[in-house]
C-alpha cells in the first residue's frame, strides 16, 4: 500500500479508551427503490387490484388547474415509462396512479372534459368563459377604434381629396 494513504487512514482511526471517537463510516443514502418496495408491500396488504381500460385520469386542483394523466397513444406506446396504471381498493377507499402527470389549464382540456366536471369546476368554467368573452369584447372594441382612425370622416359638401390633405 501507499504510505501516504496508510497514514491518512491511521489518522482517521483512533485506538484508545473511553471518550475517543470511533472510525468514521460513510452513510449510505436510501434510494427511492426501497420506498417503492415498501409502498408496493403496503398496497398488496390492502388487496389493491388493477383497473383495466383507463384512458385518462384528471385531478382538479383548487386554483383551476388540472393534473392530467393520459394513457399512451399507439405511436407512443413503445416508449418506456409513459404508461398510466391505475390500481384501486374499494373497501379501503384507496386509489394508486402510476405514470407521469402533466399540470394543464382547464381550457386545454375543455372539449373532452365537460362530462367530468363537478359543480365547483363548472363554476370556474363559467368564470373562465365570461373572462374570455370580455377579452373578445375588448379586442373587438380596440379594432373598432383602429378602423375609425384609418377612415376619415366625410362631411356633406366636402370632397374626399380635401379631407385627406
UniProtKB/Swiss-Prot annotation:
Cell location: Cytoplasm; Nucleus
Keyword Cytoplasm: yes
CDD domains, A to Z: NAC_BTF3 (cd22055)
PROSITE patterns assigned: NAC_AB
GO terms under biological process: protein transport
One of the record's GO cellular component terms: nascent polypeptide-associated complex
Record field: compositional bias (Acidic residues): 145-158
Residue ranges of domain NAC-A/B in the record: 33-110
Alphabetic keyword roster: Cytoplasm, Nucleus, Protein transport, Repressor, Transcription, Transcription regulation, Transport
Keyword Transcription: yes
Subunit annotation: Part of the nascent polypeptide-associated complex (NAC), consisting of egd2 and egd1. NAC associates with ribosomes via egd1.
Name recorded for this polypeptide: Nascent polypeptide-associated complex subunit beta
The organism of origin for this protein: Emericella nidulans (strain FGSC A4 / ATCC 38163 / CBS 112.46 / NRRL 194 / M139) (Aspergillus nidulans)
Amino acid at each position: 500500500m501507499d504510505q501516504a494513504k496508510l497514514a491518512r487512514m491511521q489518522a482517521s482511526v483512533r485506538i484508545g479508551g473511553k471518550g475517543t471517537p470511533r472510525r468514521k463510516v460513510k452513510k449510505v443514502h436510501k434510494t427511492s427503490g426501497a420506498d417503492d418496495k415498501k409502498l408496493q408491500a403496503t398496497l398488496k396488504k390492502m388487496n389493491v387490484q388493477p383497473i383495466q381500460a383507463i384512458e385518462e385520469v384528471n385531478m382538479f386542483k383548487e386554483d383551476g388547474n388540472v393534473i392530467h394523466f393520459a394513457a399512451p397513444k399507439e405511436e407512443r406506446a413503445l416508449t418506456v415509462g409513459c404508461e398510466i396504471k391505475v390500481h384501486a381498493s374499494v373497501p379501503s377507499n384507496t386509489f394508486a396512479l402510476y405514470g407521469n402527470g402533466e399540470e394543464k389549464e382547464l381550457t386545454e382540456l375543455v372539449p373532452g372534459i365537460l362530462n367530468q366536471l363537478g359543480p365547483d369546476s363548472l363554476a370556474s368554467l363559467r368564470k373562465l368563459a365570461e373572462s374570455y368573452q370580455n377579452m373578445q369584447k375588448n379586442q373587438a372594441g380596440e379594432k373598432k377604434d383602429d378602423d375609425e382612425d384609418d377612415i376619415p370622416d366625410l362631411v356633406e359638401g366636402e370632397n374626399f381629396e380635401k379631407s385627406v390633405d
